[in-house]
């Protein structure tokens, strides 16, 4: 996939310096990545949407953080249960999920 229609970044950081407050990794962000991949596959969107885990975005208190490009929309306090709504509303229908947007 050279030019995906959407690119989803999920913070999976487990910052070890003790200064951050959220620790996305400890809030099951790896499960969020897996759920995105499963949801996209079930909707036959895997060839159009790339999902990557990433390091800290610097706003741990609102994590887990998900960022969707090309729109540059940031979502906070995301759980695996929110993934279906993000895929259906944002990816398929172009509508930002306002309740999660930061």
From Swiss-Prot:
Extent of the signal sequence: none
Cofactor binding annotation: Binds 1 [2Fe-2S] cluster.
MF term (GO), any: metal ion binding
Cofactor: [2Fe-2S] cluster
Pfam family, one: 2Fe-2S_thioredx
Alphabetic keyword roster: 2Fe-2S, Electron transport, Iron, Iron-sulfur, Metal-binding, Transport
Residues given in the record as [2Fe-2S] cluster binding sites: 11, 24, 56, 60
CDD domains per record: TRX_Fd_family (cd02980)
Claim: Ion transport is one of the keywords in the record: no
Keyword set includes Iron-sulfur: yes
InterPro entries, per database record: Fdxn_Clost-type (IPR048109), Thioredoxin-like_sf (IPR036249)
Biological role stated in the UniProt entry: Ferredoxins are iron-sulfur proteins that transfer electrons in a wide variety of metabolic reactions.
PANTHER family: NADH-QUINONE OXIDOREDUCTASE SUBUNIT F
Similarity remark: Belongs to the 2Fe2S Shethna-type ferredoxin family.
Protein name: Ferredoxin, 2Fe-2S
């Amino acid at each position: 996939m050279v030019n995906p229609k959407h690119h989803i970044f999920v913070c999976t950081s487990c910052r070890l310096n003790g200064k951050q407050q959220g620790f996305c990794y400890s809030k099951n962000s790896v499960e969020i990545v897996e759920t995105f991949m499963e949801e996209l596959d079930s909707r036959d969107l895997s060839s159009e949407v790339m999902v990557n885990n990433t390091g800290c975005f610097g706003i741990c208190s609102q994590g887990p953080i998900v960022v969707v490009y090309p729109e540059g929309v940031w979502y906070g306090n995301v759980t695996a249960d929110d993934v279906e709504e993000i895929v259906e509303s944002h990816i398929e229908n172009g509508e930002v999920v306002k309740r999660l947007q930061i």
